Amino acid sequence: TFGVTIEGLKDASTYYVRYEVSNRWSSKMIDEVSEFKTIPYTIPTVQTSEVSDVTHSTAIVGGVITENGGQEITERGVVYSTTPNPTSSNGTVSSGSGKGAFTCNLTALQDGTTYYVRAYAVNAKGTSYGEEKSFTTKAITIPIVTTSSATNISYTSATVGGEILDDGGATETERGV
């Protein structure tokens, strides 16, 4: 038995091979023709991971590229939108290149809004998307404040105060009594 590796073939192509056997006195072409077809390149296979750490304006999501389709992954990341089935024409956060797991930080999101997100991967054959996930950012609400009873009461003054239990998701801009 013998074998030879043929390099530089084109994907998704049919090839025909005939073998030649030779020794130092003669050579003989084998009449039998073998046929084979090379595997076609495909777009990558990518899965969208679960969305985590959702706040009023941020979230973390990513994906896993499980198959590169026979070619180098040149870009990967997530696409997101407030409408279903986001594509690269919507919001995009890139996370480098290559096969494997990755994460992306989504920032500057609107509070109390539902977003749809999908992981994506790009190779020379094209772009593929993972399954769609959705999440809703936390809504900004009115702060929750408690007031304490007045202390140190005199004829002309008293000490009063309170505690902010929940800022409602927004940065405190003012406080007072």
Task: Place the predicted regions along the sequence by residue.
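Short, surface-exposed linear motifs at loops/turns and structural transition points
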Residues: 1-177
